[in-house]
């Protein structure tokens, strides 16, 4: 009998899918249109357009920007669109919504670039532990992308997994 210790995890055919690898490390900022409202309620078009024209949008260079309004004011859609036209040339990504919407869009962008063919008929472990906060959206989107391809999908670490999906025979 051999006393050799065999690492069966290392020699298994599992592919680890680590969502942390798809985390965009860039700065995230919120542009709150509330700062452009009169009495936190009214967007005055003339003043807003003048502000948009004169403001130094370069401060958003390379940043990920969520455009939102933190008050219950009714903001015309064109106002958000106008802001986006000025921020887009400088920012990495611009979305409408809060920081959660921004995080979701960043993960979506990264996941859309993955060559999924590598997961065809493979046993995949979606890594559960991470040094960065990975939104639940990213895990659900990963299942949507991998389920049609993978032989099986598990969650956790290769040494301790929770079965999520197994392709029917």
Predicted feature residues:
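A domain-level signal for the structural core that forms small-molecule/cofactor-binding pockets
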Residues: 52-53, 128, 137-138, 145-146
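Gly/Ser/Thr-rich loops at beta-strand to alpha-helix junctions
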Residues: 70-77, 129-137, 160-161
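Long, charge-dense
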Residues: 79-118, 156-161
């Amino acid at each position: 009998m051999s006393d050799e210790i065999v690492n069966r995890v290392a020699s298994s055919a599992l592919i680890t899918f680590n969502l942390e690898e798809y985390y965009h490390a860039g700065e995230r900022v919120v542009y709150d249109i509330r700062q452009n409202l009169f009495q936190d309620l009214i967007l005055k078009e003339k003043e807003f357009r003048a502000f948009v024209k004169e403001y130094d949008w370069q401060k958003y260079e390379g940043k990920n920007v969520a455009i939102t309004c933190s008050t219950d004011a009714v903001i015309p859609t064109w106002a958000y669109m106008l802001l986006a036209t000025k921020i887009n040339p400088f920012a990495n990504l611009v979305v409408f919504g809060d920081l959660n919407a921004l995080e979701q869009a960043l993960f979506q962008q990264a996941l859309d670039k993955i060559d999924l063919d590598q997961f065809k008929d493979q046993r995949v472990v979606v890594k559960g532990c991470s040094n960065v906060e990975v939104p639940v959206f990213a895990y659900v989107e990963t299942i949507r992308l991998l389920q049609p391809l993978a032989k099986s999908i598990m969650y956790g670490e290769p040494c301790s997994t929770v079965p999520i999906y197994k392709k029917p025979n």
